[in-house]
């Protein structure tokens, strides 16, 4: 075992099973299962160990979980558990990092479709607001998802920390769908002595780092590339950057030279999000992944390191971080990427003047060859991008890189909410939940329709509820309902629903109706040499592409390319319901269609 990169599973402490009883007053009663071990320590070496104590079995009888405020007078109506965490460090100077989470074994759909079934993990014991570490609700979560409690908690000496886990149904809950439900949660965790920070984003001359201020509306501000507020992947805050007009309300040079100034949205041409280089732990080499959704174990990696695992439990560098610059199929020196920039939204604008913007219709009805050409335009001088950088249509492996990161502890780590904006497919829109769980009458309670989408979607990219079936914002805002890969405004949008997105993934150089006269250079597309998912990449599994490894996760469509339909598209469309999602994959002949859009990526010289 590589002692410098070992990860040690440390906890399997407390299983709490809740059984629904139902009733006019009591929504739930709960009871323990058989006796559980509640304090387990795993020690791999003599250097350190970690343990946690969940407080013993639940044996105190029933608690009636009813809609409630949480205070000293309502203790019979909510769950509160003390959790003691004890790292033991036996080597002077050793630093370790602990993660703690709740594994969801089962969760009723009524509990997954409300904002009011809530949790909080705190350092204080007086209330769920007393020293919050993490808090939220279970909206959009299903079995095999995790609820984050601690992430990379740093310890430099032996100690015992006490935290408090709160679970309750908020007093604002009025929906009867939360009755007659059940859930099963397991406290779990891991510990490591290695923490690798993500590679710093590599900026092209035209890319300007930004942050989002959502305290009063949505204000986009420039930020220094060395400012710690730019990104924090451990807190699911991904790095964003923009391309701007050379001369708009302000000049490009002004924005580049002045960190902290507000950017006029009319000056923005494109938004990008940085996906830092990483390796991930292989969890399967077969095709039977359906129903086996899990947190993807990701470790950030420097360009000096290439991981080449091929067996379950080993690590492999994600293939999107090799840019085969000379298209010779050989991994040459200088071709390892520190990361890639991915379009934050589906490509917008026109074929001759593309943009990447929110709240506008995506660019559709192009053949793959035309999409490929349009994506390259975003790398031109009009956008301020240097000729040494490479703007291109997103490859299938690059789609995989973004989705794998989203389903790790650094992303939303659940199914991404759907963009349910119909027909014109406005970018960045959200149904406020996962596909299949967005009926109109649940969001707009004065409506009776159970249709899962409308013309404009329900929420904007920055969380504003739209007035029903209009393109105008209401004053109501729900930042936790955005449809991004992080669950917040810093992530990538439109990867579930919206338009179907062609990607540069092709069966055996089969052009079909794509419009190409010959295939582009090999660095621009992923070539699948067979129609078997187990042998399509150099005779083996296509690691990292979001194919066999994530086959039919969350019930997403799972078709492979063929001689008749040789081009992949991803994500599903706005009206696919539960079949849409970031792991959705389908095939087509490369022709144009009003539902088919695409996404642009950018490889920066020096990355």
Describe each PLM feature range.
Residues 196-313, 328:
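N-terminal module-boundary/linker segments of secreted carbohydrate-active enzymes
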Residues 397-400, 421-461, 471-472, 486-487, ...:
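C-terminal, surface-exposed recognition/capping segments
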Residues 16-20, 29-32, 71-136:
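Surface-exposed interaction patch
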Residues 3-4, 64-73, 128-169:
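Extracellular adhesion/glycan-binding regions together with long Ser/Thr-
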Residues 30, 77-101, 106-107, 145-195:
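C-terminal, structured domain-capping segment
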Residues 262, 266-269, 301-495, 604:
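Short aromatic-cysteine micro-motif
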Residues 2-72, 177-196:
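Short, polar/proline-rich extracytoplasmic segments that appear immediately after membrane translocation
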